Amino acid sequence: MFTKTFSNNYMTSSQSAYCNLQQYHDSRVCLLKCCRVQKVDPYFPRIALNSATSYPTVSGTVSLPKAETVEPDLWIKSFKGNEDPLLSDGSHTGVNQLGGVFVNGRPLPDTIRAQIVEMSQHGTRPCDISRQLKVSHGCVSKILGRYYSTGSVRPGVIGGSKPKVATPRVVECIAGYKRANPTMFAWEIRQKLIEDQICGEENVPSVSSINRIVRNKSFMAQLATPTSVTPSVARPSSATSQNQRSPPRGVQQHMQQSTSVQQLQQFQLTSAATVNSLISRPAFAIPGTTHSINGLLGTFPHSSLLDDKFTNLSTHSADMSLVYPTGLVGEHDWAMRTPMVILPQNYCGQL
């Protein structure tokens, strides 16, 4: 009797303990299911947790939330608002760890960028900005760094060529600054362009670009300076060049022929004058300075010999400078062997 009563009591206590354990397990499962954060994916339906539904368990009934399917577009609009510029183009969207929606390959809208800068100016830390706006910390830091360096919140250009910053107006302003102050540095010119509101932080030329513009301007100025030659001689006026028309082709040939004939006649006259100067015989030659017998004896060669040689020279006057040196007459004559010296008039014939 005692054993049966003890066994009944033991079974009752064991059943109650098992039921309590099962109830505790069911409650923990319900708590985990209610607190679990679902993975966000805008391309699949979401489950909305609405009114509770009772589910039977071993220990009794447990209330669980009711599952309701929501369309993806409605869920996305309810997540970030009905008018989200990130979702307007229909690109591939994603959700970061903070729950913010982003589009791959697209920068943040200007409104969010301006809001980031405004919150930073009010003293909000970047980490707090990241949590409040649901934007990654790296994106916030990059936007603020770009704003502090360039003064602009607009995103950079992805691909393509940069816009031209050295416009004609900017080039002329740089040249004017350099003419006004030749010792001005390139970084001072860059700062001056920003102060005069000729350029902004986005389109101001770099220091290397300004140096290149200054070098090109100085080179062009050197080319523009006139040379030492008289301008009227070096560069005749256009009116003069137009008035001086070239003669016809036949007239040009005739003029060239006449010019060549005149040059030939002048050369012949010069040769004849050279021969006549050689015909004039010297008054006396210094003894011992010549190597011919005529020079040693103080006599002159026969006149017929001189006439023959001068006749040959006159007929071949054009080639005389190539055969004999200047001032010489013939190969076997005393005048060709040695140089001649003209003595003064008061010379009496003795050395």
From Swiss-Prot:
Region of interest: PAI subdomain: 94-150
GO molecular function terms listed in the Swiss-Prot or TrEMBL record: DNA-binding transcription factor activity, RNA polymerase II-specific; RNA polymerase II cis-regulatory region sequence-specific DNA binding
InterPro entries: Homeodomain-like_sf (IPR009057), PAIRED_DNA-bd_dom (IPR043182), Paired_dom (IPR001523), PAX_fam (IPR043565), WH-like_DNA-bd_sf (IPR036388)
Keyword Nucleus included in the entry's annotation: yes
Positions of the UniProt region annotated as RED subdomain: 169-217
Function: Transcription factor. Involved in negatively modulating apoptosis in germline and somatic cells, acting in partial redundancy with transcription factor egl-38/PAX5, probably by directly regulating transcription of apoptosis regulator ced-9. May bind to the DNA sequence motif 5'-GTAACG-3' in regulatory elements.
Entry protein name: Paired box protein 2 homolog
Gene name of this polypeptide: pax-2
